[in-house]
Amino acid sequence: MRIVVQRVKHASVTNDSVDNKINKGYCLLVGVGKSSTEADIATLAKKIVNARLFEDADGKLNLNLQQVEGEILSISQFTLYADVRKGNRPGFTQSMSPDCANELYEQFNDTLRSYGINVLTGEFGTDMLVDIANDGPVTIIYESQDGKII
């Protein structure tokens, strides 16, 4: 499982059936790979919720999402598993099938919510307009395999 975490001042996602917006928090771009498991969900959710990516009074990255009462906008993004080694068109054979990926994506969001975080989402498997006001910018890529951060 591969997740791009962006600290944001605000972020939104819209399409024909979704219109969600958060203020201060994280915008997550969530990729589910063929080998992603429930262990990866638990590992990454805990790591992201506890990540100290917000500045304290001294300007150090020392505060986590809960300490700043932040929110999460979670966006599914199968293109995070693009293979660009051959040719000019990316391949997506390392992305999990949509049905299975959606199930793990929903479990991931539910796990984040279990920490008391307000989590809004886009619509899985559709084209969406995502507006991100990256704060800093602070952008971190998290990846887990077999329940371990890699």
From Swiss-Prot:
For this protein, the record's InterPro entries field holds: Daa-tRNA_deacyls_DTD, DTD-like_sf
Presence of keyword Cytoplasm: yes
Q: Name one GO biological process term.
A: D-amino acid catabolic process
Q: What class of enzyme is it?
A: hydrolase
Q: Where in the cell is it found?
A: Cytoplasm
GO MF annotation terms: D-tyrosyl-tRNA(Tyr) deacylase activity; Gly-tRNA(Ala) deacylase activity; Ser(Gly)-tRNA(Ala) hydrolase activity; tRNA binding
Which keywords describe this protein according to UniProt?
Cytoplasm, Hydrolase, RNA-binding, tRNA-binding
Q: Which reaction does it catalyse?
A: glycyl-tRNA(Ala) + H2O = tRNA(Ala) + glycine + H(+); a D-aminoacyl-tRNA + H2O = a tRNA + a D-alpha-amino acid + H(+)
Predominant place of localization: cytoplasm
Q: Which GO terms describe its cellular component?
A: cytoplasm
In chain numbering, motif Gly-cisPro motif, important for rejection of L-amino acids lies across 136-137
Record remark: domains:
A Gly-cisPro motif from one monomer fits into the active site of the other monomer to allow specific chiral rejection of L-amino acids.
NCBIfam families this protein is in? D-aminoacyl-tRNA deacylase (TIGR00256)
- Quaternary context: Homodimer.
Role, per record: An aminoacyl-tRNA editing enzyme that deacylates mischarged D-aminoacyl-tRNAs. Also deacylates mischarged glycyl-tRNA(Ala), protecting cells against glycine mischarging by AlaRS. Acts via tRNA-based rather than protein-based catalysis; rejects L-amino acids rather than detecting D-amino acids in the active site. By recycling D-aminoacyl-tRNA to D-amino acids and free tRNA molecules, this enzyme counteracts the toxicity associated with the formation of D-aminoacyl-tRNA entities in vivo and helps enforce protein L-homochirality.
Q: Which family does it belong to?
A: Belongs to the DTD family.
Record protein name field: D-aminoacyl-tRNA deacylase
Which organism is this protein's natural source?
A: Staphylococcus saprophyticus subsp. saprophyticus (strain ATCC 15305 / DSM 20229 / NCIMB 8711 / NCTC 7292 / S-41)
